[in-house]
Amino acid sequence: MKYTLEICAGSYYDALEACKGQADRIELNSALHLGGLTPSLASLILTKTSTDLKVICMVRPRGGGFCYGEADTQTMYADAKLLLENGADGIAFGFLNEDYTIDIPKTEHMVSIIKQYNKEAVFHRAFDCTDDPYSSIETLIKLKIDRVLTSGQRNKATEGKELIKDLQSKYGNQIEILAGSGINSTNAIELINYTKISQVHSSCKEWLFDSTTSNTNVSYSYNGKDQYDVVSSIKVKELKDSLCGKQ
């Protein structure tokens, strides 16, 4: 069986690394240290012209949660259209109400935008913040979401494997289940074999040093070590090889 490897990319550089490591698909973002925000059009255009990767673009206007006011919502709709017009193969997004349920009208409208371009609608890990994963996934199916990214409502997919397995068993023939968070070359196959999913999402992260992140009196560091995170093509290839049974 062929397994799909999706890499969480935070830039055009990351996309190139994912391609070098033989990923099948990327979720293109910016600001991964905030959980991933909407990418620039330039990063999408460069990725599509330089690689053969399937590119799902994140549409998320800010950090924090997923209950959006009118300004953020309109920004998301407009961003989705621009990204789709410039070659995105799909859009990853999530709308929740204050009570942790799926915001049906906003989700429905976003899906309608995506389907105008015949592209994929992906509900991201906002799903992991919902109050009831079963009623939530049934709602997403009714709204014609193609795929849901989930860690099984735990911090790591390995911790949420029971729910992932159950969702795959009950709904896997109606919606694609994409497991993500904490997946690497050492645990991917075990998770796949246990849950019966066929695709995984990973950051394959490494850290690079930039001395200009701080000086004696000023710091722009977010991890305290004057480093920033990028995708490692070596880790991508290791994960890909593990999925292909080469390790």
Task: Please tell me what each predicted stretch does.
Residues 1-39:
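N-terminal pre-domain/capping segments
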Residues 13, 32-53, 71-73, 97-114, ...:
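Active-site-adjacent beta->alpha loops and helix N-cap segments on the catalytic face
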Residues 26-37, 82, 86-98, 145-158, ...:
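Glycine-rich phosphate-binding active-site loops on the catalytic face of alpha/beta enzymes
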Residues 18, 83, 110, 124, ...:
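Conserved, mostly hydrophobic/aromatic
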Residues 171-247:
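C-terminal alpha-helical cap/extension of soluble enzyme domains
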Residues 3-9, 26-28, 55-59, 91-93, ...:
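Hydrophobic faces of well-ordered beta-strands that scaffold small-molecule active sites
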Residues 10-20, 67-79, 128-143, 167, ...:
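Catalytic cores of alpha/beta
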Residues 45-84:
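Structural motif corresponding to the early beta-alpha repeats
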